[in-house]
C-alpha cells in the first residue's frame, strides 16, 4: 500500500485558492484562469479591431466570447472556501491526475475538526488516489453533524448556526466545483463511523449526483434498541451537541436518516460496506493506561458497528439489493483500519466513476 503523503502549504482566499509561492499557472498545481479579466480583455480587443470607415455598410457586432471555465490543473492540492447557508466552508481538494471530471467525496468522523479533514492527515488517502483521474473532495468541519440538515441549532452548546450539511454537499458544493470542471453527476461518496450512514443516505436520496457509496464502520441500524440514546451520548461527548436539535425522536427527519428505512432507495447503486468485529488487530499497539483505554473504547464502538452492519446486510438481502460487504477478521474503530478498507474499496469506486 502507498506510504503517507506529505502535506503541502497552501495560500487560500474565498472562492478559490492560489498556488504555493513559486508555482505558476499551467503547472501541475497552478491556479484556475482569471475568468473576468480574460473576458474584459477579449471584449476590449474585439472593439479595437472593428473596421470603422465612412460609408461602410452596417456591421453586426459579434457576440463576446464566453468566459472560460475555471478549470483546476491536472493534479495538485488546493484548499477552497465555499459559500454556504452555514457560512464559508473550507474544502480540501486533490485534483484529478489528468483533469478528469469524476470526484470522490471523503466525509469525516464524529470528531471532525475545523482546520483539516482527517482523511488528509490520518491516512494516506491522497497518495492512494494521486495517480488516478478522480478528484478527492474533503469537506472540513461538521462535528457531530451526521452531515444532515438539522431542524435547529444545538441548544446544549450555544451553537449559533443550524447545520445544513446535506444541502451543502448536494447543492452548494457541487455547483461550486462545477466551475472547476468537476461533474455534478459523476461522483462517489465514502464515510466512516458517523459519516458511514450519511454517505449511504446522500447516495440513496441524490442518485443523480452519486454513482457509488461506501460505509466503513458505520452504525447502520438506527431502530435498534437504545441506538438513539447511544447516538445522544456520542454527540454530547463530541462537542456537547443535542441529538434532538438534529431531529425529533421518530420524526420524518429522523427516519429519513435511518439506513434501514431508506434501504429500498439503494437498489442498483454499487456499494462497498465494511466493519471489523472489534477484536484488536495489527494496528492496535496501546501504550500505557491511556492507550489501553482508547483501544478498549475503539473495540466497543467497532463491535456495535459490526452488529448493525450485519443487520443492514440482512435488510438488503431481504430486499434483493446487491452490495459488496467486507468483514475483516480483526480490527477496531480507528483510522489505520479505515485506510486499509479505502484501499479495498478503491477499484470499485474507480470502476463506477469510469476513472
Give the label of every model feature segment.
Residues 19-21, 34, 48, 62:
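Short stretches within intrinsically disordered, low-complexity N-terminal or propeptide regions
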Residues 26-38:
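Short, Lys/Arg-rich cytosolic juxtamembrane segment immediately N-terminal
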Residues 2-16, 39-46, 53-355:
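Non-catalytic cap/lid and distal C-terminal segments of serine-dependent acyl enzymes
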Amino acid at each position: 500500500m502507498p506510504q503517507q503523503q506529505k502535506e503541502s502549504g497552501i495560500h487560500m482566499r474565498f472562492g478559490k485558492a492560489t498556488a504555493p509561492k513559486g508555482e505558476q499557472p499551467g503547472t501541475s498545481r497552478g491556479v484556475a484562469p482569471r475568468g473576468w479579466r480574460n473576458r474584459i480583455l477579449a471584449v476590449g480587443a474585439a472593439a479595437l479591431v472593428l473596421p470603422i470607415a465612412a460609408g461602410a455598410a452596417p456591421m453586426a457586432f459579434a457576440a463576446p466570447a464566453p468566459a472560460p471555465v475555471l478549470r483546476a490543473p491536472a493534479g495538485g492540492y488546493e484548499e477552497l472556501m465555499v459559500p454556504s447557508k452555514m457560512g464559508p466552508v473550507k474544502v480540501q481538494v486533490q485534483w484529478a491526475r489528468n483533469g478528469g471530471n469524476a470526484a470522490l467525496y471523503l466525509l469525516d468522523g464524529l470528531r471532525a475538526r475545523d482546520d483539516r479533514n482527517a482523511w488528509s492527515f490520518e491516512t494516506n488517502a491522497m497518495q492512494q488516489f494521486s495517480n488516478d483521474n478522480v478528484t478527492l473532495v474533503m469537506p472540513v468541519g461538521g462535528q457531530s453533524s451526521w452531515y444532515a440538515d438539522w431542524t435547529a441549532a444545538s441548544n446544549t452548546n450555544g451553537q449559533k448556526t443550524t447545520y445544513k450539511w446535506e444541502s451543502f454537499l448536494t447543492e452548494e458544493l457541487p455547483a461550486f466545483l462545477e466551475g472547476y470542471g468537476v461533474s455534478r453527476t459523476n461522483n462517489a461518496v465514502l464515510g466512516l463511523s458517523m459519516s458511514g450512514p450519511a454517505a449511504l443516505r446522500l447516495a440513496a436520496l441524490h442518485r443523480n449526483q452519486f454513482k457509488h457509496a461506501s460505509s466503513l464502520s458505520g452504525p447502520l441500524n438506527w431502530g435498534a434498541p437504545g441506538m438513539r440514546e447511544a447516538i445522544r451520548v456520542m454527540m454530547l461527548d463530541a462537542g456537547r451537541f443535542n441529538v434532538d436539535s438534529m431531529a425529533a425522536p421518530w420524526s420524518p427527519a429522523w427516519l429519513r436518516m435511518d439506513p434501514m428505512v431508506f434501504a429500498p432507495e439503494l437498489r442498483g447503486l454499487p456499494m462497498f460496506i465494511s466493519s471489523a468485529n472489534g477484536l484488536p488487530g495489527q494496528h492496535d499497539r496501546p501504550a500505557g493506561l491511556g492507550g489501553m483505554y482508547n483501544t478498549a473504547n475503539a473495540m466497543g464502538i467497532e463491535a456495535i458497528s459490526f452488529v448493525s452492519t450485519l443487520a443492514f446486510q440482512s435488510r438488503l438481502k431481504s430486499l434483493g439489493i446487491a452490495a459488496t460487504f467486507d468483514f475483516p477478521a480483526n480490527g477496531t474503530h480507528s483510522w489505520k483500519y479505515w485506510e486499509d478498507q479505502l484501499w479495498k474499496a478503491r477499484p470499485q469506486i474507480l470502476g463506477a466513476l469510469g476513472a
